[in-house]
UniProtKB/Swiss-Prot annotation:
GO terms for molecular function: ATP binding; metal ion binding; protein folding chaperone; protein-folding chaperone binding; unfolded protein binding. One of its GO terms (biological process) is chaperone cofactor-dependent protein refolding. It is found in: Cytoplasm. This is Co-chaperonin GroES. One of its GO terms (cellular component) is cytoplasm. Together with the chaperonin GroEL, plays an essential role in assisting protein folding. The GroEL-GroES system forms a nano-cage that allows encapsulation of the non-native substrate proteins and provides a physical environment optimized to promote and accelerate protein folding. GroES binds to the apical surface of the GroEL ring, thereby capping the opening of the GroEL channel. PROSITE patterns: CHAPERONINS_CPN10 (PS00681). Belongs to the GroES chaperonin family. Keywords: Chaperone, Cytoplasm. Heptamer of 7 subunits arranged in a ring. Interacts with the chaperonin GroEL.
Amino acid sequence: MLKPLENRVVLRVKEEEEKSMGGIVLTSASQEKPQTAEVIAVGEGKTTNHGTLISPLVKVGDTVIFEKFAGTTVKMDGEEFLILKDSDLLAIVE
């Protein structure tokens, strides 16, 4: 499993529906990149210049919305994950 460093989080991106609302099957080129994901792992946080540790606000299991082109995609054990900084997260879905 991946263990993110500092203020990074590991996400499992949720696949979007491959059909339009009208039932038309979309090609991968016409689909927008998904922006919703499940948090799989969370780093310990980032240390400020004054030595204070600032922990990420998300926890494992949270569903989040992230910036459209954020992060780095990594494949591990046949599965694809996205690693990004917690500042690239926009919201927690409740």
